[in-house]
Amino acid sequence: MRFKKFAAIILMSTMIGTMSLSGCGGVNKDAVAITMTSDDKDAIEVTMGYANFAARIQQAGYDSVFASYYGDDYWTNDSYAKDGKNMQESIKDSVLESIETQYLLEKHMSDYGVEITEEDQAAIKKAAEQFMSDNSKAALKEVGATQEYVCLLYTS
């Protein structure tokens, strides 16, 4: 029964997050995109800032491959739709699922004897610093990058 309740909360959070990611205008970085709860664990909240950053990074990866083949409108073009969802909607769902998985796995690392060592954290921090210095301020602003978000992404 606990699992069904947890799954329902995750589904609801995903739907709310998906609607939030698809909104117009700027992103409220501090707004909550996803809240995950269960009976035996504390709530996990994911901000819109991080969700937007993760989506933008994935978008950039797709653009580098698909835009030259399918044109700039492939994100919203219904001729590429699958299961009634265009590419943009599918990727938003995928990003939110990936973020949920990332946070849940991180939350349960100790259950499986997995840890991120100080060496690992130092390497992640160094890689994030490199990411921030390798990209222009305009590019970082476009994807909503902060060093904190890059570290989170590299942790997953």
Question: What residues fall within each predicted segment?
Answer:
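Bacterial N-terminal signal peptides that target proteins for export
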Residues: 2-10
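Long, compositionally biased
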Residues: 149-151
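Conserved small/polar residues in nucleotide/adenosyl-binding loops
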Residues: 154-155
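Bacterial N-terminal signal peptides
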Residues: 11-18
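C-terminal motif of bacterial Sec signal peptides marking the signal peptidase cleavage site
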Residues: 20-23
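N-terminal targeting/tethering segments
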Residues: 27-145
